Amino acid sequence: FHPKDLPGALVEIDSVTNTNYKEKYADWPPAGSDWRAQVNEDYVLGIVGVTIAAENPDKLSKLWSDVLDSKLTVENNYPCVVTENAKITFVQAEIGYVDLVGIKIKASNERVKLGRNIKMLGLDIEFISE
């Protein structure tokens, strides 16, 4: 999807034939044939959430919910799109601004002990326990 069609992040929806997309390490040809050998889960296990700031979070969350065919809920007064393995939270932004502003990463307890929150280049990163 082009960011103008689905604002907030670059979204790509693909599938690979002859594989179960629900498997954590399902085939993904663009990554090459030996990508699984490069996986290291000592600290990071996966992305489980993102936060998108939008001028109209209610409207944008409805669009994302429709496009992703996923449930739209409200948590802590913020609209959220709930997918099979992650949650997309929409928050209020300044006028004319739409962007990814946070990610939530499932991490090992060892990583979490190093610190739960960091900010990098304006992006809030939160590490949560396994």
Question: Where do the protein language model's features map onto the residues?
Answer:
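Vicinal oxygen chelate
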Residues: F1-G49, P79-G96, G102-E130
